[in-house]
Each structure stands twice: as structure tokens, then as C-alpha cells.
């Protein structure tokens, strides 16, 4: 396990009674009299530990391998490494990051079915053996570059009910799977298991059942060909926040019986998964500052009974956009909703508004329409559930820098992380400590932020 002390974490350790919300307000207050009101994140590492406890309870047979691509922030990876999770890496760079933090190669799966030969060789030279494939060409590459690899066959699934579909790009059909297994046997390459991914934002948990059933078929094919497969990877697609139609426990409530049916506990099959957004989405809150404002007058309709306020809309420009943190709107099908840092007056008027990023691109729009009280340059907007597929894909287009991330952790969360590193960590401690962890940036009832009335839903995770 990775033993490290507070000094190794670039993290603010919260005093008793303080939460991530307090740090966010503190950072805003610190720059209130300055012109440098840059966008920033507050990330609650304790929220990630709470998610891990929740995972252990909901999917006790499934070992999580965190999808590094979702958020490769070093503090996130290090926190999860301390809990003993594995890691789903998609490239040489991600493998380097994870191994630089002391994670052994046995806790890494190179889960990219289409790999560059030089990166396959890098994995071989650094002890990473588990890797996925879905084609004969990939088999040939691995046979030459990493003959001792432990291969996992990625199969296609019905991801028609997912927001982000992956089977259009990855996965072998059942018919092709048999041919690939036979070819792997000819090449003397060891196939140790099967993987699949039902897609992100899956709205039908029965998709998992069908995929697990298909995986069982491929296991049986493997046995007929002569492989003794022992690994099932059920992929990702687990929600990372509560503002979704299908809750995490609703999904796991369907997965567990399917696993027991097709891969019972006495089958000798190890089961892993590749959660990404599940762990990090709700841990991050983004604060952006209004840097410009434009009033747009609507064309007069001639109606006498129209409220004068309805004749204008507001355009707000903030210092992060779709080329930065909000790339999730373009690439992850996210719908974001702002929170107001200042509580509006009860009788304050609301206006039709739109929110735009800082770049020169006319497509840099964050929210097409929402109802907000009139705001001003220098005011702050907050966006919750911004930990997944945001900072990892942010660019510096137009010279706009990525927001700073301020990590926080409570005392109980820190103690829990130390307990995770104890090999004798008892299951009963897990539930006991879950309730002691503080609420993160999903504000407690007495401190709730005022939520703007937007046409779009909260971020889709």
C-alpha cells in the first residue's frame, strides 16, 4: 500500500466543523478586492472516499479499477491508490502516472483495444500484463510486442440506451469472438478474460444483464478453445451524482444477481469494473467569474400588457468555457446548471439569460438559456458535479489557462484513508466511518445555494 503523510498531499486539511463549501467561500473572499478573479475548483477528496465505501457495500464482489482518463489529477489518483483500487489506463502516459505513485503493475489494466506498438512495448517493459483487444490485428501486434501479455477480449454490447455510446468503435461480436479466441490460441497468446462497456449514462440496467450473459457465452467459447479464463471486466457507466434518472444502487441491484447467476462466487472468476465519473463527478465544484455582460433588447411586439423586463435578455461571459472545463458539453453530452454564489432577494426579478465562455469562438456557449436575476461583472457562478471529463480534456485555447484546483479533506476522511491502507481493515469499520465524513460541495440543507432556473438539466453523468 502507499503510505504517505499529510506533507505529501497538496491538500487543505479542514479544521473540525469546516467543509469544502467554507473553503470555496474563503477563496472567493480572498480575491473579492482583486482584479484577478480567476476560475477555480474546490475538490473534496473525502467525497471520493465516501464513494469508495459506497462501492464496497453495493458491489462487494467487484474490484474497481479507476478510469484515469476521466480525471487524471495527481491528488485523485493518489487518493484512490491509497484505498487499494486498481487503475484502468488507456496510454503510456497514464501508466507512467499511476506507477509513479507506487501502484504495482498487477493493479493496472491497459484497457485500450487499439494500442500503438511502442506503447505495448512500454507496458511489457514495465510489467503491465493485462490489456484488452477486439481484433486480429491487435492480436498480431501483441504477439510480437508483448507475448507474455494476459489478454482480455472486449466484446460489443447493446449501448442504444446510453448517452455516450462506445460499441460503435470498440468490441467484438459474439461470432467474431470465437474466431479471435481460435486465432489467439494459434498465436500462443493467453486470453484470461472478457470485458465490455455498456456506455456512459446508461438508462437501462438490463443492458448489464445481457452483457454479462454474453460474457458467459464467450467464457464458454474460451473453454472450448482451450483457455482457462478467470477475469470478467464489467466496464464503466456508473453515475457519479444523484441528479440522474437511474441511481447507482438501482444499477448494482440488477448487476449483482446477474453476476451470481452467470459467474457465481465459487466459479473462480475475478470480477473488476472501470468506474470513472462515479468516483470524481460530485467531488468537484467549479467557481467562475463574470468578466463581461451584454444587454440584448428584444424586438418590440406592440403588446401593452408585456412587462418591460421581458423586453431584454442578458448575455454573461465567464472565465472558463467549452475549450476549458466545459468541454464536457461537447464531448460528454453534459448539461450544466449554474448556482448563484450570492443569494438573490425574494422579490428579485429574473431575466432570460445565456452564459458564454471567454474565447473568441462563437460556439463557446455554456448555457443557451436560463432564468437569472440581473448579475454584474465580478459576480460568481458555481457549477457542481464538475469532476468528470472536465479538467482532463481542458485546453489552453486562446491562451486561457486551466483553473487551479484546491483540494480539501477532513480529519475523519484522512483517518479513513489511513485505515484503508491497513491490510486488516475490517468491513464493519467501512460503514461506521461513512457517516462521519462531511458533506462535500453538495451543500447541507441549511446552507443551500440558490439554484438558477435553467432550461437545461443538471450535468448528465
From Swiss-Prot:
Pfam family, one: Orn_DAP_Arg_deC
Active-site annotation: 360 (proton donor)
GO CC term, one of those recorded: cytoplasm
Biological or metabolic pathway of the protein: Amine and polyamine biosynthesis; putrescine biosynthesis via L-ornithine pathway; putrescine from L-ornithine: step 1/1
Residues engaged in binding substrate: 331-332, 361
Residues marked Stacks against the aromatic ring of pyridoxal phosphate and stabilizes reaction intermediates (site): 197
Catalytic activity of the protein: L-ornithine + H(+) = putrescine + CO2
GO biological process entries: cell population proliferation; kidney development; polyamine metabolic process; positive regulation of cell population proliferation; putrescine biosynthetic process from arginine, via ornithine; regulation of protein catabolic process; response to virus
Reported effect, residue 360 to A: 25% decrease of in vitro nitrosylation level
S-nitrosocysteine sites (modified residues): 360
Gene Ontology MF, one: protein homodimerization activity
Induction (free text): Down-regulated in response to enterovirus 71 (EV71) infection (at protein level).
Keywords (A to Z) from UniProt: Decarboxylase, Disease variant, Hypotrichosis, Lyase, Phosphoprotein, Polyamine biosynthesis, Pyridoxal phosphate, S-nitrosylation
UniProt cross-references to InterPro entries, sorted A to Z: Ala_racemase/Decarboxylase_C (IPR009006), De-COase2_C (IPR022643), De-COase2_CS (IPR022657), De-COase2_N (IPR022644), De-COase2_pyr-phos_BS (IPR022653), Orn/DAP/Arg_de-COase (IPR000183), Orn_de-COase (IPR002433), PLP-binding_barrel (IPR029066)
Mechanisms controlling activity: Inhibited by S-nitrosylation. Inhibited by antizymes (AZs) OAZ1, OAZ2 and OAZ3 in response to polyamine levels. AZs inhibit the assembly of the functional homodimer by binding to ODC monomers. Additionally, OAZ1 targets ODC monomers for ubiquitin-independent proteolytic destruction by the 26S proteasome. Inhibited by 1-amino-oxy-3-aminopropane (APA, an isosteric analog of putrescine). Irreversibly inhibited by alpha-difluoromethylornithine (DFMO).
Phosphoserine: modified positions: 303
PTM description: S-Nitrosylation inhibits the enzyme. S-Nitrosylated in vitro on 4 cysteine residues.
EC number: 4.1.1.17
Residue numbers of N6-(pyridoxal phosphate)lysine PTMs: 69
Cofactor: pyridoxal 5'-phosphate
Annotated residues for binding of pyridoxal 5'-phosphate: 200, 237, 274-277, 389
Known function: Catalyzes the first and rate-limiting step of polyamine biosynthesis that converts ornithine into putrescine, which is the precursor for the polyamines, spermidine and spermine. Polyamines are essential for cell proliferation and are implicated in cellular processes, ranging from DNA replication to apoptosis.
Family from the record: Belongs to the Orn/Lys/Arg decarboxylase class-II family.
Subunit and partners: Homodimer. Only the dimer is catalytically active, as the active sites are constructed of residues from both monomers. Does not form a heterodimer with AZIN2.
Pathological condition linked to this protein in its record: Bachmann-Bupp syndrome: An autosomal dominant disorder characterized by global developmental delay, alopecia, absolute or relative macrocephaly, and facial dysmorphism. Neuroimaging shows white matter abnormalities, prominent Virchow-Robin spaces, periventricular cysts, and abnormalities of the corpus callosum.
Protein name: Ornithine decarboxylase
Source organism (scientific name): Homo sapiens (Human)
The encoding gene: ODC1
Amino acid at each position: 500500500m502507499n503510505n504517505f503523510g499529510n506533507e505529501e498531499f497538496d491538500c487543505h486539511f479542514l479544521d473540525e466543523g469546516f467543509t469544502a463549501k467554507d473553503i470555496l467561500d474563503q477563496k472567493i473572499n480572498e480575491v473579492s478586492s482583486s482584479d484577478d478573479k480567476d476560475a477555480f475548483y474546490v475538490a473534496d477528496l473525502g467525497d471520493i472516499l465516501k464513494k469508495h465505501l459506497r462501492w464496497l457495500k453495493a458491489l462487494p464482489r467487484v474490484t474497481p479499477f479507476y478510469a484515469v482518463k476521466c480525471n487524471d489529477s495527481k491528488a485523485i489518483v493518489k487518493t484512490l491508490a491509497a484505498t487499494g483500487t486498481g487503475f484502468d489506463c488507456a496510454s503510456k502516459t497514464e501508466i507512467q502516472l499511476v506507477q509513479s505513485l507506487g501502484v504495482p503493475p498487477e493493479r493496472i489494466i491497459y484497457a485500450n483495444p487499439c494500442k500503438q506498438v511502442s506503447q505495448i512495448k512500454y507496458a511489457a517493459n514495465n510489467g503491465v500484463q493485462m490489456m484488452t483487444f477486439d481484433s486480429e490485428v491487435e492480436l498480431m501486434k501483441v504477439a510480437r510486442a508483448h507475448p507474455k501479455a494476459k489478454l482480455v477480449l472486449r466484446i460489443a454490447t447493446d449501448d442504444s440506451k446510453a448517452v455516450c455510446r462506445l460499441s460503435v468503435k470498440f468490441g467484438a461480436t459474439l461470432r467474431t469472438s470465437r474466431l479471435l479466441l481460435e486465432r489467439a490460441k494459434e498465436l500462443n497468446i493467453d486470453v484470461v478474460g472478457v470485458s465490455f462497456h455498456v456506455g456512459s449514462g446508461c438508462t437501462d440496467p438490463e443492458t448489464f444483464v445481457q452483457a454479462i450473459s454474453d460474457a458467459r457465452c464467450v467464457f464458454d467459447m474460451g473453454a472450448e478453445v482451450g483457455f482457462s479464463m478467470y477475469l470478467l471486466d464489467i466496464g464503466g457507466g456508473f453515475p457519479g451524482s444523484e441528479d440522474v434518472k437511474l441511481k447507482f444502487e438501482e444499477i448494482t441491484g440488477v448487476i449483482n444477481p446477474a453476476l451470481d447467476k452467470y459467474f457465481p462466487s465459487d466459479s473462480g472468476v475475478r470480477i473488476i469494473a472501470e468506474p470513472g465519473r462515479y468516483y470524481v463527478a460530485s467531488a468537484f465544484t467549479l467557481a467562475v467569474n463574470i468578466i463581461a455582460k451584454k444587454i440584448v433588447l428584444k424586438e418590440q411586439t406592440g403588446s401593452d400588457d408585456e412587462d418591460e423586463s421581458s423586453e431584454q435578455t442578458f448575455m454573461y461571459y465567464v472565465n472558463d468555457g467549452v475549450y476549458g472545463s466545459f468541454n464536457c458539453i461537447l464531448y460528454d453530452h453534459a448539461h450544466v446548471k449554474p448556482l448563484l454564489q450570492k443569494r438573490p432577494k425574494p422579490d428579485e426579478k429574473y431575466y432570460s439569460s445565456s452564459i458564454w465562455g471567454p474565447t473568441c469562438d462563437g460556439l463557446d456557449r455554456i448555457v443557451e438559456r436560463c432564468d437569472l436575476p440581473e448579475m454584474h461583472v465580478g459576480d460568481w457562478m458555481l457549477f457542481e458535479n464538475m469532476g468528470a471529463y472536465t479538467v482532463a480534456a481542458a485546453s489552453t485555447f486562446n491562451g486561457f489557462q486551466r483553473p487551479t484546483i484546491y483540494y480539501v479533506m477532513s480529519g475523519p476522511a484522512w483517518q479513513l484513508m489511513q485505515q484503508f491502507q491497513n491490510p486488516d481493515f475490517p468491513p464493519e469499520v467501512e460503514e461506521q466511518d461513512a457517516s462521519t465524513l462531511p458533506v462535500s460541495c453538495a451543500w447541507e440543507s441549511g446552507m443551500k445555494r440558490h439554484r438558477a432556473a435553467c432550461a437545461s438539466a443538471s450535468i448528465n453523468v
